[in-house]
Amino acid sequence: MQQRMTFWYLLGYSLSKAIARTFFDYRVIGAENIIEEGPAIIAPNHASFLDPPLAGTACKRAIHYLARKSLLDWPVMGPLMPEWNVIPVDPKNAERSALMGIIRVIRAGGAALIFPEGTRTKDGRLQPAQPGIGMIVAKTGAPVVPMRIFGSFEAFPRDRKTPRRVPITVVVGPPLRFDAAEAAGRDAYQKISDRVMDAVAGLKV
């Protein structure tokens, strides 16, 4: 798994940051909390299609992402998805294909972006956490960096075809670490996920 920024990744990263700063007055608060080396999970809220690049450009390291397998069929951008560390999700076997891919990345010392809520909000409010991120934490022992993106829902909610020019701020909280006892057993998955989501909810501008 690619842990460093390749030419194409760095190009996408640089363009995303330039666009975010130009059109959304993009800023990051708490960037010093991001784990820049070794296994890590970046855990932002999910309000918009813009969230993956907004979260990724807050980091100074290569991040791995989940995306629908169909996105790889997009003209121009599709072939670049693997260069941007996109792990395709097969809708017919989403849980296994996605989660196992992410676990391999993290165990190899990489960083992955996981949305605790699992899907985009419909109304801009935070949603309950799903157990997926808790399972990944339990399987890998990786620390979790809570992150909250303010403004992405107002800029590009589900029902819009084009984004609005709205200020966007990313707030990063201190990493969360879970010991072996906290990660033991299936009932731990949801508890870990809930703790991560509580940390995300507690972040303020």
Indicate residue ranges for each PLM-predicted region.
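Non-catalytic C-terminal accessory region of glycerolipid acyltransferases
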Residues: Q2-L11, S97-V205
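Short gly/ser/thr-rich secondary-structure transition/capping motifs
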Residues: R21-I29, N93, S152-A155
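A short beta-turn/loop motif at secondary-structure boundaries
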Residues: E32-I35, T162-P163
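Conserved functional loop/turn residues at catalytic and ligand-binding sites
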Residues: R27, N45-H46, N85, G109, ...
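Generic beta-structure capping elements
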Residues: A31, N45, R68, K92, ...
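Conserved beta-strand scaffold positions in the cores of enzyme catalytic domains, especially
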Residues: V28, Y65, V86-P88, V144, ...
